[in-house]
Amino acid sequence: MERATKAQIAYAEKLLRELGYDVEDYPLSEMGKREASKLIDDLKDELYG
């Protein structure tokens, strides 16, 4: 599994904070690229509708 990029992790953290989630609840540094991408897509859908 290819690990999530630093950019993916940083963007996911930004979205999580904007939505009021605790970043510590998400193992971002352990996620793969695909998993991080899906999380980002889900967070964007929640934030932007």
Name each model feature, range by range:
Residues 1-49:
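A charge-rich, low-complexity, intrinsically flexible signal that marks solvent-exposed coils, linkers
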